[in-house]
Amino acid sequence: MLIVADENIPLLDAFFQGFGEIRRYPGRSLDAASVKDADILLVRSVTKVDRQLLEGSRVRFVGTCTIGTDHLDLDYFAQASISWSSAPGCNARGVVDYVLGSLLTLAELDGVALAERVYGVVGAGEVGGRLVRVLHGLGWKVLVCDPLRQAAEGGDYVSLETIVQQCDVISLHTPLQRGGEHPTWHLLGPAQLAQLRPGAWLVNASRGPVVDNIALRELLLDREDVHAVLDVWEGEPQVDLQLADLCTLASPHIAGYSLDGRQRGTAQIYQALCRFLGVDEQVQLADLLPRPALAQVELDASTDPAWALATLCRAVYDPRRDDADFRRSLSDDPQLQRAAFDQLRKHYPPRREIEGLAVRLRGESPQLAQLVSALGGALV
């Protein structure tokens, strides 16, 4: 059996060497010739997998180690009887950590209390749903927009217009859909952006085209009170340099790039392939994850909760490091800039998740205990 895989998928050998030969290629360079003789294709979001890539090949299973599937032509897969799997939720915690770190930075810049802001989460799937649970656990006011879940479940969902008009913070977590009943391409365009509240914060860690980047650039040129945090970009790895300069925080599509999340994505595709082949799993992710460099933090029960929140989040992740690295990589030469974008992702340093952090409290503090629980840490 021949497996063709994106070279940047972690733990390829550990999970897949027992199935046969593995050939690695840069994800953006995969073409029909590369996959012609493959039985299994393993990709990330940078590879468009469609008829043009697969027609005439032996591929019968496609696995993408990502949450999103907008790079997969699922209609063609159905026509060609090609099985597939994504990795839903694999990096959800990493994205939540990214958002929390960004909020802490913006709060310090504006001198505001996070607990006093109104949060709007657009898209309540694996990532957005987890973020909502964390924010609710912290006791913060959250409005949620998800028309698909609202139609299926009912509940206290609100419209996008309500989010834009009433929320101080908007965090986007939708898949990219260009058509259908609820398209998300340019979900936030000129009309929506013009309605942002004074001092609004906008975070996009979903897909670049969910926000009209040109319209956002024009808004930021006109309104210095608005903060934008962008991890995803229209046309990436090409980046609008002026827009990047106007963003308060900017990064190269790494919000979900925690070590745990990336390896969890590989593990989920391995499990799906085992089911497809009808074989038992022989490898477990828990046996492969290294011990975190920082495994435990100790807090006194008298610790200020706001300080504790910042300390715990930044003990695990601080987006300002990624922002600085990204800005240093930007270049007026489009070819150099695209290459730098991919290199930052390829050589991204190990980053763990807050759910792997143990917290010991000296004394009793129900408020701190609730904070740790909301973040997903473990009280010991």
Swiss-Prot record:
PROSITE patterns: D_2_HYDROXYACID_DH_3. Pathway: Cofactor biosynthesis; pyridoxine 5'-phosphate biosynthesis; pyridoxine 5'-phosphate from D-erythrose 4-phosphate: step 2/5. Homodimer. GO terms for cellular component: cytosol. The active site is at R207, E236, H253. InterPro entries: D-isomer_2_OHA_DH_cat_dom, D-isomer_DH_CS, D-isomer_DH_NAD-bd, Erythronate-4-P_DHase, Erythronate-4-P_DHase_dimer, NAD(P)-bd_dom_sf, PdxB_dimer_sf. Its EC number is 1.1.1.290. It catalyses: 4-phospho-D-erythronate + NAD(+) = (R)-3-hydroxy-2-oxo-4-phosphooxybutanoate + NADH + H(+). Keywords: Cytoplasm, NAD, Oxidoreductase, Pyridoxine biosynthesis. This is Erythronate-4-phosphate dehydrogenase. Belongs to the D-isomer specific 2-hydroxyacid dehydrogenase family. PdxB subfamily. NAD(+) binds at D146, T174, A205, S206, R207, D231, G256. It comes from Pseudomonas putida (strain GB-1). The keyword Nucleotide-binding does not apply. SUPFAM superfamilies: Formate/glycerate dehydrogenase catalytic domain-like, NAD(P)-binding Rossmann-fold domains. One of its GO terms (biological process) is 'de novo' pyridoxal 5'-phosphate biosynthetic process. Substrate binds at S45, T66, Y257. Catalyzes the oxidation of erythronate-4-phosphate to 3-hydroxy-2-oxo-4-phosphonooxybutanoate. Its main location: cytoplasm. Gene3D superfamilies: 3.30.1370.170, NAD(P)-binding Rossmann-like Domain. It is found in: Cytoplasm. GO terms for molecular function: 4-phosphoerythronate dehydrogenase activity; NAD binding; protein dimerization activity.
